Curated annotation (Swiss-Prot):
Keyword Secreted (UniProt): yes
Organism this protein belongs to: Glandirana rugosa (Japanese wrinkled frog)
Function: Mast cell degranulating peptide.
Residue(s) carrying Serine amide: S12
A GO BP entry: mast cell degranulation
Record keywords: Amidation, Amphibian defense peptide, Mast cell degranulation, Secreted
Superkingdom of this protein's organism: Eukaryota
Tissue: Expressed by the skin glands.
Subcellular location: Secreted
Protein's name according to its UniProt entry: Granuliberin-R
Signal peptide range in chain numbering: none
Major subcellular site: secreted
Annotated GO CC locations: extracellular region
Length: 12
């Protein structure tokens, strides 16, 4: 995941 501005985790 990495499409949410509040869910920009490095381990997508």
């Amino acid at each position: 995941f990495g499409f949410l501005p509040i869910y920009r985790r490095p381990a997508s």
